């Protein structure tokens, strides 16, 4: 999982990326290609 300040560019790298908020943190997850995981931090 990558930790980035801005998730907007990571969201646009794959069409299945989703931006999810869990426990006050923002994540990018991808069900079909799991290497596109990232957390905002």
UniProtKB/Swiss-Prot annotation:
Which NCBIfam families does the entry link to?
Answer: PRK00831.1 (NF002021), rpmJ_bact (TIGR01022)
Q: What's any GO biological process attached to this entry?
A: translation
Gene designation per UniProt? rpmJ
Q: Which organism is it from?
A: Rhizorhabdus wittichii (strain DSM 6014 / CCUG 31198 / JCM 15750 / NBRC 105917 / EY 4224 / RW1) (Sphingomonas wittichii)
UniProt keywords (A-Z) are:
Ribonucleoprotein, Ribosomal protein
Is the Nucleotidyltransferase keyword given for this protein? no
Q: Which InterPro entries match?
A: Ribosomal_bL36, Ribosomal_bL36_sp, Ribosomal_L36_bact
> Which Pfam family, just one, is annotated for this protein?
Ribosomal_L36
Q: What is this protein called?
A: Large ribosomal subunit protein bL36
Per the record, its GO cellular-component terms are: ribonucleoprotein complex; ribosome
